Regions:
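Generic structural signal for small/hydrophobic residues in well-ordered secondary structure
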Residues: 6, 23, 45, 62, ...
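A short helix->loop->beta-strand "cap" motif at the edges of active sites that frequently abuts
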Residues: 102, 162-164, 190
């Protein structure tokens, strides 16, 4: 049988020409940039996301990383609690949780629920010990199923009720063609960390640029991520950050 590898999700498409040209034009940029990311890029990402999500995000909410995967790993290291992980899921969530010494609470999803957990299934996990901290990983559109979560409001109510933090992995969100993508941040922005980047829609997986958008209500967590980032990757490649400004300020709807 043929085995399809979904671990990397390598895009078969080329990077838009204007973004490639922006990288060429900024190849000379050789200075360390601010650890949280180039100010102009964070501003562009915040404005782009605010329009997409209909919520007012600020540059201060944005953390630029060398791929969203690295930022997720830092989150696992920092988080003191248990990880609620739907199954099946992307290959690196569980190993990162183990490396971060966090216990995994796995929820086996079902076809009838579109391969996403229900609110009651999440609540059942939390009720085992309400005194613990919980972090839910929600990947929609999903790798490997390709499905979109349709019970976002139900899950958001559980998040609000039990102070559940949600990592919303939206790396494939620009590649939803059958229906308009909806983020769980539309229902509970104060509990949601948005994770995405250039790898999929832009075809720039090898450039290694991703970002977190962390709401003001989770500032303590954001500041802790910044501290860890400063002691690990320090800053993302300067030429790539400058080039990425074009990705979030120009219209690429025809490309997508």
């Amino acid at each position: 049988e043929k085995i399809f590898k979904f671990g990397f999700g390598q895009s078969p498409f080329q990077i838009p020409t204007d973004i490639v040209n922006a990288l060429k034009d900024n190849a000379y940029q050789n200075k360390y940039l601010p650890m949280q990311g180039l100010n102009e890029l964070r501003d562009a990402v915040a404005k782009y996301t605010s329009v997409k999500k209909d919520y007012n995000y600020k540059p201060e909410n944005v953390i630029i990383g060398p791929g969203s995967k690295e930022l997720m790993f830092l989150l696992h290291i920092l988080f003191d609690g248990e990880i609620i992980l739907p199954a099946p899921s992307w290959v690196s969530y569980a190993p990162q949780a183990i490396l971060g010494r966090n216990k995994i609470q796995s929820i086996q999803t079902k076809r009838e629920n579109n391969w996403f957990p229900t609110g009651s299934e999440i609540e059942e996990v939390i009720l085992k010990d309400k005194n613990k901290n919980y972090l839910l990983f929600l990947n929609s559109p999903n790798n490997p199923s390709g499905q979109i979560c349709k019970n976002l409001e139900e899950i958001s109510e559980i998040a609000k009720k039990y102070n559940l933090i949600i990592l919303s992995d939206e790396i494939y969100s620009e590649l939803s063609f059958d229906e308009e993508f909806k983020s769980i941040s539309s229902y509970c922005p104060e509990k949601t960390i948005i994770s995405t980047g250039l790898s999929k829609w832009c075809g720039a997986g090898g450039w290694r640029l991703g970002y977190f958008i962390v709401p003001d209500s989770l500032n303590i967590l954001k500041n802790s991520i910044n501290v860890l980032a400063s002691e690990t990757f320090s800053a993302v490649s300067a030429p790539i950050q400058y080039a990425a400004i074009t990705a979030y300020t120009s219209d690429h709807s025809i490309y997508i």
